[in-house]
């Protein structure tokens, strides 16, 4: 079954971004990518996305700063924050879900699916 949902993935680590894109596109999602917060905001403003998945550590803006600005622009779009930290990062109240890096792909896709269905 093909999903018609568009997901914006933001990460400055090319390998992590490529892996996330592979998992999501294999599940039928259309995936857009950005390597930093400024590029992500440009895409977010110009294209309708159904979900944003961002890393916490990004150049120029943190993932939580990016999430806060995105929620200000389009509050209904769910935002997932990826973090290598065990505890939730400061500012994560602007996100709908915090996931730790290294989550198994099946669990990752289940959580993404639940957020998109809301």
Name what the model sees in each region.
Residues 58:
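Receiver (REC) domain active-site loop signature in two-component systems and cognate sites
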Residues 36, 62-65:
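Acidic catalytic/metal-coordinating carboxylates
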Residues 1-6, 104-118:
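Non-catalytic signal-transmission and effector/linker regions of two-component phosphorelay proteins
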Residues 33-51:
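Acidic, metal-coordinating helix/loop segments flanking the phosphotransfer/catalytic sites
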Residues 55:
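Active-site residues of response regulator receiver
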Residues 42, 64-75:
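Short amphipathic alpha-helix used as the core "switch/output" element in two-component signaling
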Residues 4-15, 20-24, 52:
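Conserved acidic segment of CheY-like receiver
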């Amino acid at each position: 079954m093909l999903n018609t949902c568009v997901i914006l993935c933001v990460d400055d680590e090319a390998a992590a971004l490529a892996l996330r894109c592979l998992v999501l596109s294999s599940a039928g999602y259309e995936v857009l990518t950005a390597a930093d917060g400024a590029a992500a905001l440009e895409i977010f403003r110009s294209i309708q996305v159904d979900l944003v998945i961002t890393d916490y550590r990004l150049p120029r803006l943190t993932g939580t700063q990016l999430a806060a600005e995105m929620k200000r622009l389009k509050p209904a779009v769910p935002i997932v924050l990826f973090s290598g930290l065990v505890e939730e990062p400061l500012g994560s109240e602007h996100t709908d879900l915090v996931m730790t890096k290294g989550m198994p792909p099946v669990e990752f896709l289940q959580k993404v699916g639940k957020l998109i269905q809301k």
